[in-house]
Amino acid sequence: MKHLIIVESPAKAKTIKNFLDKNYEVIASKGHVRDLSKFALGIKIDETGFTPNYVVDKDHKELVKQIIELSKKASTTYIATDEDREGEAIGYHVACLIGGELESYPRIVFHEITQNAILNALKTPRQIDMSKVNAQQARRFLDRIVGFKLSSLIASKITKGLSAGRVQSAALKLVIDREREIKAFKPLTYFTLDAYFEPHLEAQLISYKGNKLKAQELIDKKKAQEIKNELEKESYTISSIIKKSKKSPTPPPFMTSTLQQSASSLLGFSPTKTMSIAQKLYEGVATPQGVMGVITYMRTDSLNIAKEALEEARDKILKDYGKDYLPPKAKVYSSKNKNAQEAHEAIRPTSIILEPNALKDYLKPEELKLYTLIYKRFLASQMQDALFESQSVVVACEKGEFKASGRKLLFDGYYKILGNDDKDKLLPNLKENDPIKLEKLESNAHVTEPPARYSEASLIKVLESLGIGRPSTYAPTISLLQHRDYIKVEKKQISALESAFKVIEILEKHFEEIVDSKFSASLEEELDNIAQNKADYQQVLKDFYYPFMDKIEAGKKNIISQKVHEKTGQSCPKCGGELVKKNSRYGEFIACNNYPKCKYVKQTENANDGVKQELCEKCGGEMVQKFSRNGAFLACNNYPECKNTKSLKNTPNANEIIEGVKCPECGGDIALKRSRKGSFYGCNNYPKCNFLSNHKPIDKRCEKCHYLMSERIYRKKKAHECIQCKEHVFLEEDDG
């Protein structure tokens, strides 16, 4: 019988299959095979603890059946998902769905997808690490609880569609704080005195009459001019010349955050784009040696390097650059993050033999750019440091001192690979105590500038330094903030939108820990402790949940609604309050602004256009048009005393045929149908054909799976969505 290996992605499965013989079958889970319910909290919370309600997504049901069938036939089923917490959890869920004891599923891990790495992993399996699984579950539960409970509260107090989250809100707070700094900034004009001596020496005033000048200290233009006038009369000598040798240390190899930062600043890639390309390079691409992974795992906060890779790099440096560029021993780096998962490796090429030039005919241009960046950085990390000579010259007179600085490259070291953008600034040959002639003295005005807005790269750097999130969350967090219309990224600068200020103001006042970077970092440490079996994940959840829910309940009562409603100028007939226009998922309506104390609702005039008013046959009241998820209907305006309702004749009829669109299953007609749960679109050949869609089908095919598309509103935007694979395409809004 064959052995079964389960990985996450089809690309990874395809690459691994190339390395193994016929005795192995490789299948991809396509990410998580089950998750918390999308339509509810998905977690049962009681005195016994937190129990998840995991649901297999309908897109995964057939795949799960296939995995179970293959596993039953296999002599051994290997779990080969990624070696981070997310990968460990995916493997755990797959094993649970197959059934049986977890110990019966060997867990294999590897940091690169090469034949040697896969074969070695098969020789050294371990068991599924439940500490890692529990850490992932704790993170998932925390994110769901915060997102579900807090987002609902925020949306009810500001406007629908807004959200808050454990990591996203802490990141958004950083952006808002920077915006506040920029708005509060007041420019300062200050002056420097810049001297030009012969021959070709530029220097700046650093002290006057025995007093050291601080940066930006000279702010009085008149005073600056007076000092200039005095110093122009002085005679000058070379007071001191100091020369020092200084090393520029090699940079460490990349981890996730630094790769995203460098790819942003050097290649112009967004973090999301960087990770997408890196994923392809890791999972397998065409090379002269066949399809294989050309970089190690790209979601890592470790700077460890395998011994074999270090030896390869050192051999390469010695061969191509000579012994002067090779340090006496391999360089070892450690992450500043004390909780870095050191079992992982830094991001490096899987084979130093695969130079970028050797792959230029195999990789796409953007793939080659990122691979080149990773390759050069890794090789440079094992070279000698660059060596500079720094020079400092002080020119003095009786009343002041001027200072000039210079730098000269003595040995290029790792610059041989990475290059050096800093040009040498050479000072003329001078001798101490020699006189020097002042050629010109200028008083120059400067204006301070506000703090720069974050770029995606600099925000990731701050998130990492503060311990907010993990390598796998940086790019998705920024993408989520953009998608929620909290931030926009233009010309590499992140700016906050108005809704972001409102959300953060509420969170700062009522949920300060959610936006507190220290709290977020401490929670990450708790998750790390769970992963290392130093903390119980149920207890960590309890410690967070109950105080948090107390604040949610308090927020419902105490947070003042910031929703803006258009005034009608009319008074409420029930309590005398003011009637305002409001919106719900069913349309616009008029209601009393004293809600919830007064629950009077009046339908808007627009909603009644074209609808004949009737008298209620039960109480004599007026029948007015209202809306529900099933469409428009007539209801008595004396509700709740009278609950009479009546369907509208001009409501779209059930079984109304959708013109120009045929059933993708049998070619029959598709019609609008109704049930007690609402309207839907189904095939007229039911029950012989079971095709149905919650959204209106259109005469268009999905580019991904070629199934029928539908039109819908997705995340507040018009979109076409595949009825089968759920691939969606946002539609461009008309400018007019």
Predicted regions and their residues:
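Conserved short loop/turn motifs at secondary-structure junctions
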Residues: 1, 82-83, 159-163, 243-252, ...
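Intrinsically disordered, low-complexity regulatory segments
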Residues: 1-140, 149, 218, 423
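Basic, low-complexity terminal or inter-domain segments flanking catalytic cores
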Residues: 2-3, 15, 22-24, 97, ...
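C-terminal or mid-to-C-terminal helical accessory/interaction module adjacent to the motor/catalytic core
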Residues: 117-197
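Metal- or metallocofactor-binding catalytic centers and their adjacent structured scaffolds
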Residues: 214-252, 434
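Short acidic, hydrophobic short linear motifs in intrinsically disordered regions
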Residues: 241, 250-263, 289-298, 450-462
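Short, hydrophobic-biased segments on the C-terminal half of alpha helices
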Residues: 275-279, 478-479
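A short, conserved structural fragment
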Residues: 282-296, 484-492
